[in-house]
Amino acid sequence: MSSDLEAGSLISIKKNVKDIMIPSEEMKLEVYPMDYEEFCDATGNNYGLLQQIYDSGAAIGQATNRKLMRDLRIYMAVGGMPQAVEAYVNGKNFSEIDMVKRQIISLYEEDFKKIDASGRMSALYHAIPAHLAKDARKYRITTAIGKRNNTKAEELLYELIDSKTVLPCYNSTNPRVNLTDTKDFDSYKLYLSDTGLFVTLMFIDRPVTENDIYAKLLSDKLPANLGYLYENLVAQMITVSGRELYYHTWDKKGSTHYYEVDFLISEGSKINAFEVKSSGSGKHESIREFCNKFSQNISKAYLISQKDAGKEENLLLEPFYLLPFLIK
């Protein structure tokens, strides 16, 4: 096998390599993960039902909503990488599926080291879950690599973004105008292009992620606040729709805290705002303040959570599994 095929990301695709092979398993590695519709088709779930639910515009009841959220959490746990999906369809347990995902991450790291043998590019990739877990206003290169920021580190970041293994989300400094025109290149967050790989990277400090952890994830009983995991899911879904990722953050008057709206997308001359909550409970202070501040510029404001569809004043409540239909 030619050595230039032994790669895992678009770093190799840029050299016109289309079929990437995992040397040990002889598995083709497709860079782009399956979206949720493709995953449902591959696993025998009825994606068309979600379209019907969306078209109805009505709540579906707690039992059905719980079932559909569990189905979506399976997608989050497995991810959309074809090898992981194949392992799931073939009845592998989640620890075995996790090992497949670790192989894919290892291939990415091999690609990263072809560009940067020091390991800094891999460190930038590995730091993404921790950055999001801290709920920081932006991704900091210096936190990831432990060194002073410099031009070389920024070049590695752009190489990482070009590899399509990560998704950049830029702060829009003024959502009143075109999001692209107000993109702050120095203020951004990073997500992974596949949420299944994100789950594995969250627990990469252990040799394998145990079935028990996956069982708790599927039943929504992990002890940690997993809002950042659901943010990654939303980032992936928005990207699949062909849109760039934007968010907006601004200081809270008279406080050291700040407001933040997780995602913004353009709709005609206006914008739709999205706040992501793993639970759906809470005051939703940021998006309400955003609606007050930018009332003339907003088309719709959504709270995306695990709860059934509904409405709170001018805030539309929607479950995660309906997001693809909201952003078409």
Describe the role of every protein-language-model region.
Residues 3, 155, 161-165, 169-328:
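A cross-kingdom feature that marks ATP-driven nucleic-acid transaction machinery
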Residues 3-9, 30:
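Structural recognition of the conserved hydrophobic beta-strand(s) that form the central parallel beta-sheet
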Residues 9-14, 33-38, 173, 197-198, ...:
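Conserved nucleotide-binding/hydrolysis micro-motifs of P-loop NTPases
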Residues 12-28, 40-46:
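Short regulatory helix/loop adjacent to the ATP-binding pocket of P-loop NTPases
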Residues 14-17, 41, 87, 202, ...:
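Short glycine-/acidic-enriched loop or helix-start segments at secondary-structure transitions
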Residues 26-30, 301-303:
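Conserved beta-strand scaffold positions in the cores of enzyme catalytic domains, especially
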Residues 27, 49-54, 321-326:
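A polyampholytic, Gly/Pro-enriched intrinsically disordered region
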Residues 41-230, 256:
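Interdomain hinge/linker elements that couple catalytic modules in large macromolecular machines
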